[in-house]
Amino acid sequence: DKHSLALYTNGVECMDEIPDSYDHDKICFVGNMRTLQNQDAVLHFVNDIFPLILKKKPGARFYIIGAEPPRNIMALAEKSENIVVTGFVDVLSDAVKDSCVAVAPVQIAAGIQNKVLVAMGMGVPVVMSSLISKAIPELESGTNCIIEDADQAFADACLRMMDNEADRNRISRSGYDTVRKYYSWQEKLSGYDHLNADS
């Protein structure tokens, strides 16, 4: 019966509220590190973008949060005290929610990126490449995220989130509201009970 069918697209868990405080020096990347596109994005950030941030913010720290990091990703933390590789974490929100900004400089296409939605659903603003933004039509640079492709512009956007609390909190709130409205499981499954009752 077609009336008993429903389509549920991609969704993520959203926090009930945006955290009141955050670590101004913490930048994070969220994603399963066994995938090529995530490894490539992290290496691109570490090699080409993070050094530009460290010139202005020598205390900045980059957290690579995700299961199954290969040896070359693990080695990044051994080479720099400013880089932390967490590997798998039991409670993702505990590792992500206090970040000042999340980054997604993805250069290899891979559909909708949960890494972006997860961070935004925790109230963490995201700086991302235009490639990754194309999979999420509700995104608007400067409103609910920041979209940059050039290395210096990407670094500058991260620095702005670290330096300008009002701007950071504005994008944090808008991003959180966007994900909660369009991509949260809470919203997507709100009609499930009605569907089940009618079956």
Locations of the language-model features?
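Conserved acidic donor-binding segment of nucleotide-sugar-dependent glycosyltransferases
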Residues: 144-152, 160-165
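Acidic donor-binding loop of glycosyltransferase active sites
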Residues: 82, 97-111, 122-125
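Flexible glycine-rich beta->alpha loop in the catalytic core of nucleotide-sugar glycosyltransferases
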Residues: 90, 107-109, 125, 131-134, ...
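Short acidic/histidine- and often glycine-rich active-site loop of Leloir-type glycosyltransferases
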Residues: 130-147
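A short, well-ordered alpha-helix in the C-terminal region of glycosyltransferases
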Residues: 160, 167-181, 188-194
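Conserved catalytic-core segment of nucleotide-activated headgroup transferases in glycan assembly
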Residues: 2, 6-98
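Short hydrophobic beta-strand element within catalytic cores of glycosyltransferases
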Residues: 115-119, 125-129
